[in-house]
């Protein structure tokens, strides 16, 4: 059974599954039954933490498609899993509902219906919108916790100042920010704050859009329709070449530990911080099981120190960006399913 970690009061497997790829983001999506089977297999091998969002699916299907898929896959084990989903709040919705609380609750009720549940374990504000008070969102989340509709709440792509203000209003269970061997900005302030205040840290894109697996090369051709990797700066040919020394470091440790590059990249962050729970995403069952297997890869303190030193000696070229959810478009395509 996979080791467990805590996101404040939520006990989750050390590695979760990011479910977005079953509905969009990585090109052609799998057949429904394949996706359902993949999530169930992940549960069978010890994963109890599954991450979705109301917006996932809006390009190929419709917003909410991914939540429906996750709900269907895990309905028979609902009490044994921790479901995380996210909302994006627009100012016009707040105005229409008369309050931030009513707007947040309306999103939550819709998500619960799609997930087939009467509560959500972890409810994130997907992105901060400067036109909507995050302080009021934090207060609304507290009311929803008191009503038993959510067990905890979180923020995504948040800075430490905003996090601290929100946490003072309603204690935050988890922060979901980008973090990997190529994206380490959160190590300066956000992760230390989370450690100090008993807040879980849930990295998205922990394998850097697949780059750290070593399977993305200058010859890789991404799919034409709905493949966000086409727009990731780190996956431009010149940056793939320039970041090769990082893959060389990973390859050395993969041989040492009889593991894959992706597993080493996940084991590294698990060793580094006790509150980190990565949620690598994939639409491929083999990759999902490989990623979950990283929980069994244990680095000694000496091995970790050597790996950290080798990484620190490398220069990272390019950045990952937030191509799925750029602020100027994110949430604007929301249409209710007919």
List where the protein language model places each region.
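Glycine/proline-rich, positively charged
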Residues: 90-185, 189, 199
